[in-house]
């Protein structure tokens, strides 16, 4: 059975100001780069067999920094990209909250029913992510450890599948930038480990109080 180490990307420049990015290509902040270095130190002696990444820059750059000492190629997987947030992308949480009816609060409470205009439906996100993770796990049997660098929405959707949680509740999970979540499919071993980030700010936690993908 493979072990998937799911790492959320380091803090991006949009995370730092609570700006929705979705599938936009956004660079890491200086803090995000330092978080990626700390992630690299944490995995350096784990015998990582392969590294997979979302194609989006904030994840790809995190993977490049973290895996620099491993001597392994990065495999980009399109289905590991973050969920599209449609019309919200490029706007801040505060801007969305100021709209009539506070659609941000509605989305946090029920992201399945209260989808941002033009956004990717969560069931479709979960389907592609579960398929991608299954393919990665199947390629690395016999207990191999694999690093998968992706996004908060992606990891949350996958955890909901593994834990049997309704998609409407996925934002209750907390996932900090460059945290590690360990899954031995379908068993979840740990969620949001940040011990390797001691001394660094954890960045933007993916939680109901600070949710901005």
Predicted regions: what is each one?
Residues 2, 86-95, 138, 142-144, ...:
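Acidic, low-complexity terminal tails and accessory targeting/binding regions
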Residues 103-124, 213:
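Short glycine/proline- and acidic residue-enriched helix-loop micro-motifs
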Residues 1-5, 50:
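Extreme N-terminal starter segment of soluble prokaryotic enzymes
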Residues 11-66, 115-130:
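Loop-to-helix element that buttresses phosphate recognition and phosphoryl-transfer chemistry
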Residues 5, 75-77, 189:
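General small-molecule cofactor/ligand-binding pocket signal
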Residues 4, 144-153:
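Generic beta-sheet signal
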Residues 38-104, 212-213:
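Phosphate-coordination/substrate-recognition cap region in phosphate-metabolizing enzymes
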């Amino acid at each position: 059975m493979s072990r998937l180490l799911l790492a959320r990307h380091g803090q991006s420049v949009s995370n730092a100001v609570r700006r929705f990015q979705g599938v936009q290509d956004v660079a890491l902040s200086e803090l995000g780069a330092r978080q990626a270095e700390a992630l690299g130190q944490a995995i350096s002696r784990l015998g990582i067999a392969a590294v997979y990444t979302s194609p989006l820059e904030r994840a790809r750059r995190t993977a490049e920094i973290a895996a620099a000492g491993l001597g392994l190629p990065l495999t980009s997987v399109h289905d590991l990209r973050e969920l599209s947030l449609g019309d919200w992308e490029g706007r801040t949480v505060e801007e969305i909250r100021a709209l009539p009816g506070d659609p941000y609060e509605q989305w946090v409470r029920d992201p399945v029913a209260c989808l941002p205009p033009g956004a990717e439906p969560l069931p479709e996100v979960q389907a592609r992510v579960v398929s991608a993770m299954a393919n990665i796990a199947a390629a690395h049997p016999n207990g191999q450890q694999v690093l998968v660098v992706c996004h908060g929405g992606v990891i949350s959707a996958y955890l909901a599948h593994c834990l049997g949680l309704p998609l409407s509740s996925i934002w209750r999970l907390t996932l900090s930038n460059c945290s590690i979540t360990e899954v031995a499919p379908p068993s979840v071993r740990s969620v949001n480990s940040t011990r390797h980030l001691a001394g660094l700010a954890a960045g933007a936690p993916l939680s109901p109080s600070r949710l901005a993908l």
